[in-house]
């Protein structure tokens, strides 16, 4: 008797497949497509513009074996469940699978999971639906728009500026935002102002500080030293009396749960994670992690969302958890409901834990350090959003002298509320004096100890960080949750923008490309136009606009601009000026310039070929040298290999021996320093490079938590291996000394 046919479930990734198969049982076979199996060709435009923008999709070559296997499995399957991610991209992948596998509407059923838990997975399988063609059309419209812009504009940039450049509908706008901010900073006219703090003492000899506020209850700013001296002279011999004392309570509410943009912002601020890394770790938490006693568990809901909605089940679970673990007074008293901004897609919930009982402490031992830190952030933010307000006793004291008012503020926590679990990070800290105030009464005389004038100058707007750029893009409607991280990765990898510490700074190349785009393709880099395109894509998704009508409308003006630009720039070659550095050539003393090479940016002498001296750009890493406590710098060898070294170089007391017997002076290692310290010895923890899930480890040989090199995630090279490799190259590669993490690296 032939065996009964199984149902086939297709998801994107093996991790997701593993988690879901555990929930569905033996009647279902769950396999991974590994992403898109059909796409536009890489070598041609792939769009028949004359035939009403008909796309020419082809199978992805690298996935031929997967396609063949899926065809075989689907042919013998009872029903094929297309269970790709619950967004436009996932819907399009499902549609491509249906077309590629030649599935009928009856056999191809669409299921989505906002969270990968047994209840949600089984409920979804029991309630399948048809593929949403509006979602598919919205994704196709975005894909074809991006292909038209990139494929038509990039060759122009290659011919006129430099090979390898690219332009994009969202990336070019993001670059412009960084360039515009830099221009704001350059054109900013700084103005002088002064702060004036009065160091005061009460009758009970308690000292406190009050800052100049104004005169006769009217707020004033001190614009010059003369104005400051006027106040100082007027109050020098005048009495200081407490004018008013205002006491009250201040309530602070928790932040809403995370959406994609706020998760990326907070992970950048609090954890130092790039948006791309944040989304990669979040994907792991969503798809499933092995938790002892629970099996494979999807720990968070879907991470690409701009909705603040929370399910009633999640809200009730939060209520019960807070009351059980913190007490009734820590619960808000009712469900907090947060309003999603207009224009957001409300198909998904906010990002939250799937099971609040799986607290960070419960799952910590089963997670990598990055997974744990990000999960703790998500869990804490969600839990806090349903907790009671934090309550502060607030005191504002105004002290009068000769009609001038000095103000002192102080807040003291009365009830922790949600802050017992979570507090949001800040981009900027306040510089207001916050010294504790003595008990003061109105009319009480206080005594001036001294005046502390301080000259200040107004500051230009700060450069964007990755977090603040994402926030600005979200506020201006540029891109969608799925595009923030790849956009920032693109503009940095193409070196339109570089990181200066935590800030994003445009390069000369980025400014030249932006200038060309503004002059020749103003719509492409116009923020309002780009936002309008996003709104039209939303209309396609809701069925209000036909997707090809959007393409027709866009391409008419775009093709005209393209023709005009090619004519105007015929025979023109645009030179990108060298970017001067603060370093000087060790050989000839000239001011070095920044160049781009195969392995990224480096410093070069401008006198080349007369002088060919080069050196790497120094990038400071988190953590400290385990031997002397100095900074650790990221370095790149001439062959493009990245290593990490103590800033003191040979002056660092660390010593090691290379495979060739030579002495290594100064700490250096292939392992990546992290922000975390060893809980036993306090030294910086390191981890292997790459995207693996290996946990960070201690490299301090005197520490009980020391991890030998052969247990650090990848195989240690032998001296023989290193010498064999040396023969193939003109330069010796760093090699390891036994029981050390350092390897010799030649600059």
Predicted features by range, described:
Residues 2-8, 19, 28, 100, ...:
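Basic, low-complexity terminal or inter-domain segments flanking catalytic cores
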Residues 219-256, 444:
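Metal- or metallocofactor-binding catalytic centers and their adjacent structured scaffolds
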Residues 242-245, 254-267, 294-302, 460-472:
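Short acidic, hydrophobic short linear motifs in intrinsically disordered regions
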């Amino acid at each position: 008797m032939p065996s009964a046919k199984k149902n086939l479930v297709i998801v994107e990734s093996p991790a997701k497949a593993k988690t879901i198969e555990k929930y569905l049982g033996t009647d279902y076979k769950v396999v991974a497509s590994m992403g898109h199996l059909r796409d536009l060709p890489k070598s041609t435009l792939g769009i028949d513009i004359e035939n009403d923008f008909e796309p020419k999709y082809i199978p992805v070559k690298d996935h031929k074996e997967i396609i063949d296997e899926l065809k075989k499995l689907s042919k013998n399957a009872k029903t094929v469940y297309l269970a790709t991610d619950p967004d436009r991209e996932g819907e399009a992948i499902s549609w491509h699978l249906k077309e590629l596998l030649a599935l009928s509407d009856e056999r191809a059923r669409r299921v989505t999971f906002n969270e990968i838990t047994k209840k949600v997975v089984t409920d979804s399988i029991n309630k399948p639906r048809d593929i949403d063609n509006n979602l598919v059309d919205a994704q196709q419209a975005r894909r074809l728009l991006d292909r038209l812009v990139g494929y038509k504009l990039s060759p122009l940039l290659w011919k006129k500026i430099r090979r390898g450049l690219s332009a994009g509908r969202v990336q070019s706008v993001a670059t412009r935002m960084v360039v515009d901010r830099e221009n704001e900073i350059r054109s900013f006219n700084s103005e002088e102002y002064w702060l004036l703090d009065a160091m005061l003492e009460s009758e009970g000899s308690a000292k406190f500080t009050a800052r100049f506020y104004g005169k006769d209850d009217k707020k004033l700013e001190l614009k010059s030293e003369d104005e400051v001296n006027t106040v100082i002279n007027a109050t020098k011999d005048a009495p200081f009396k407490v004018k008013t004392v205002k006491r009250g309570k201040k309530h602070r509410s928790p932040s809403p749960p995370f959406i994609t943009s706020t998760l990326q912002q907070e992970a950048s601020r609090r954890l130092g994670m790039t948006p791309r890394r944040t989304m990669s770790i979040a994907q792991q938490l969503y798809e499933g992690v092995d938790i002892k006693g629970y099996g494979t568990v999807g720990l968070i809901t879907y991470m690409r969302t701009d909705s603040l909605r929370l399910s009633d089940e999640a809200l009730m679970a939060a209520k019960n958890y807070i009351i059980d673990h913190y007490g009734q007074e820590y619960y808000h008293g009712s469900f907090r409901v947060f309003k999603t901004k207009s224009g957001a897609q409300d198909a998904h919930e906010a990002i939250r834990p799937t099971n609040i009982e799986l607290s960070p402490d419960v799952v910590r031992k089963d997670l990598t350090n990055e997974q744990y830190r990000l999960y703790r952030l998500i869990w804490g933010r969600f839990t806090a959003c349903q907790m009671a307000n934090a309550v502060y006793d607030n005191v504002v004291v105004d002290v009068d002298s000769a009609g001038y008012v000095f103000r002192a503020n102080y807040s003291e926590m009365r009830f922790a509320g949600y802050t017992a679990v979570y507090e949001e990070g800040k981009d900027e800290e306040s510089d207001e004096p916050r010294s504790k105030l003595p008990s003061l009464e109105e009319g009480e005389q206080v005594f001036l100890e001294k005046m502390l004038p301080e000259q200040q100058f107004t500051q230009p707007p700060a450069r964007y960080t990755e977090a603040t750029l994402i926030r600005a893009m979200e506020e201006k409607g540029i891109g969608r949750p799925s595009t923030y991280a790849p956009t920032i990765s693109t503009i940095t990898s193409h070196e339109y923008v570089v990181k200066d510490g935590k800030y994003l700074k445009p390069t000369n190349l980025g400014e030249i490309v932006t200038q060309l785009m503004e002059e020749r393709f103003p719509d492409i880099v116009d923020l309002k136009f780009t936002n309008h395109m996003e709104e039209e894509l939303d209309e396609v998704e809701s069925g209000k606009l036909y997707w090809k009508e959007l393409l027709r409308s866009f391409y008419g003006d775009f093709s005209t601009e393209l023709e005009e630009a090619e004519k105007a720039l015929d025979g023109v070659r645009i030179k990108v000026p060298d970017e001067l550095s603060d370093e000087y050539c060790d050989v000839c003393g000239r001011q070095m310039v920044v160049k781009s090479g195969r392995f990224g940016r480096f410093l070069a002498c401008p006198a080349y070929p007369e002088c060919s001296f080069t050196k790497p750009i120094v990038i400071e890493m988190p953590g400290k040298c385990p031997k002397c406590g100095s900074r650790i710098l990221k370095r790149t060898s001439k062959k493009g290999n990245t290593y990490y070294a103590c800033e003191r170089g040979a002056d660092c007391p660390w010593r090691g021996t290379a495979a060739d017997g030579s002495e290594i002076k100064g700490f250096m290692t292939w392992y990546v320093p992290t922000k975390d310290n060893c809980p036993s010895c306090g030294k910086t923890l390191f981890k292997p490079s790459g995207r693996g899930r290996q946990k960070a480890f201690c490299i301090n040989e005197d520490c009980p938590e020391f991890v030998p090199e052969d247990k650090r995630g990848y195989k240690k090279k032998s001296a023989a291996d290193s010498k064999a490799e040396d023969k193939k190259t003109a330069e010796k590669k760093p090699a390891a000394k036994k029981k050390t993490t350092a390897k010799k690296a030649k600059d």
